[in-house]
């Protein structure tokens, strides 16, 4: 049977008819009955025990080879067009941003460049018909379909970001904390700066506040440098020179653990030693370039800069770090042959690398995504390196506040004297916050408040119960209409003439031929009510079967005739002919293929 089932198989590979629901006979009007029939493929997904896991995704090439690409493109067009023959490009980009995707996303470069070229070459005034739309989206159809089906890690992205914005505004009112003054260049930072950016593991983006202003990574670079070292050298080798335990001391103490090595990579001594391990056979410039290339990949090639003023300021006033360096040298903590001054120089350089909240959030999302950059798809860090890094961030990342942060927030994070906080929600998203005023423990005053309120509202804490935590929101769950895909919702949309709802159902891979316990479909209901737009959508976009009989033996055409909806009658009669022809052609093709297969076996 030619219908939306082929599309559903390609998108969901799940779903069943389940329990029976109820709609009345057309002679009584298609009234809402008592029962419901759940779409089990979607309902079962809600009983998950893990926050989010990526299922194997079909590539655009696979979709094209299976003949599904044109159907996906058509359905996407109908969903966005909302009954219009052409789509304004700005309407497409607005709908795209509502899913969390940005037009600047590298994965959509081909799609957006084609749209721009179409506008320049055609006289359509920025309008795309179905054919032009197909050409533009064909190379990104799988990603776009997932976005509009709300199949990303945070399905209701606009609702989620609305909550984030409110938390941001609450933290904005805070006035406590002081800008760090012990590094002269940082003392000039504007205390009113306040920005938050997030990037999910699916590449959904949101920014609020001062998110395009460059700032130095400072200590936020420590977990990144450690991750690079473990990825290139391995865990065992790196931890010959640095430990894994919280120190219980200030981050810049001259102190070693019982084994005579720095306590962990998040204190200055540990970070300096880790810096010394990178490309030991290379000169200073090559070492810095090597790390910078890694950081660029983690940030998806977004903004990355270098503050020479901060670097020089660090070198001129870094007496404590020089003391730590000489202490480490005296205790023989560096690998044999390492130049201690070169290691300190690299450490100062890396602390002076600049990012914005936006590029920093992508770096955090790369950690959240197991080392794979979400906006480029490039595998940057090993899974082992990411696991180790997040573990150390969780236990040692927030200076002397690490224990309390792990207790109250329960997420891996790293703070910096620049006022930055790099926050990771594993398997969900990464965030970068910036607010220069620091509390007495050296963490961003606004940033700490933001993180605490975020976890008090959402069940992101590592030990929040994902099944039974009723007081907290779970943005990973699909809400409302998407979650409750029932035959009642489908038939009620057809009854009320809500084509927009039907488009969303179809794009979400709902079976558009579902029946209630009277065996009535959405096409039966729409035909009985005379909703010509609904009937058109069901037969043109969804290709539903018009010959389904209800328990009284009526097909949708019979209902249209009974209630004297002449336009619907004409439309269904024409569709009957084309549907029967296509069915015949499909059967002939299937028989021919079976015959060829049989002959090849003989």
Swiss-Prot record:
Record keywords: Acetylation, ANK repeat, Hydrolase, Mitochondrion, Repeat, Transit peptide
Top-tier EC class: hydrolase
Gene Ontology terms for molecular function: glutaminase activity
Reactions it catalyzes: L-glutamine + H2O = L-glutamate + NH4(+)
EC number: 3.5.1.2
Disordered: region residues: 1-28, 46-67
N6-acetyllysine: modified positions: 279, 284, 329
Main location: mitochondrion
Compartments reported by the entry: Mitochondrion
Keyword Repeat in annotation: yes
Residues bearing PTM N6-succinyllysine: 253
ANK repeat residues: 518-551, 552-585
Tissue-wise expression: Liver specific.
Subunit structure: Homotetramer, dimer of dimers. Does not assemble into higher oligomers. Interacts with the PDZ domain of the syntrophin SNTA1. Interacts with the PDZ domain of TAX1BP3.
NCBIfam families named in the record: Gln_ase
Function summary: Plays an important role in the regulation of glutamine catabolism. Promotes mitochondrial respiration and increases ATP generation in cells by catalyzing the synthesis of glutamate and alpha-ketoglutarate. Increases cellular anti-oxidant function via NADH and glutathione production. May play a role in preventing tumor proliferation.
Name of this chain's protein: Glutaminase liver isoform, mitochondrial
Gene source species: Rattus norvegicus (Rat)
Top-level taxonomy: Eukaryota, Metazoa, Chordata, Craniata, Vertebrata
